[in-house]
Amino acid sequence: MKNLLFFSHNQKKILEVESIFDHKGVKIHNLRSFEKIKEPYESGVSFAENAKIKSSFGLKNFEIPCFADDSGICVEALKNKPGIKSKRFLEKFASNENAFEYIISNVIKTKNNKAFFKTAICLSITNNHHIVFEGKINGKIAIKPKGSNGFGYDPIFIPQGYEKTFAEMSIKEKNTISHRKIALMKLESFLFN
């Protein structure tokens, strides 16, 4: 495959993908290269199902092999929520800070700070050929948000084996250990090995 579509408008995700596929001889297109398109509603009950909904939609509409990701944070104190609704969870609060405060207060109340990030990437090659690659990183919720890098829940997530949040790490450092990186490396291995 010489051309692939990464079904995303998210500039930070796009940069992460481009850094991994740089110099691989594959042109990675993204939704920012095209006219604004309405993304499909993510009605799946798992990260993999939501990724497949998006990658299938991209393949159908652009007629090019497409991959998409669905990612989220799962917090034990919230019974592994927000999970697949991570983006919508942030949107229902007036600000990320309010969402973080809600999560942290539940972590303190339950005395359980365990959490993990999960990513599923689905590659849709044809209408009947879809392959899913997953990545997961365990960690814990910080007692207060720290750092200004990254996006989403990065200021409150401390990966296992580290003392700083994803948002305190450089983009390069985060991208060497992140859940998305793990899934993208599996995709890369499939495409190039």
Language model regions located:
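Anionic-ligand binding patches
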Residues: 2-7, 11-193
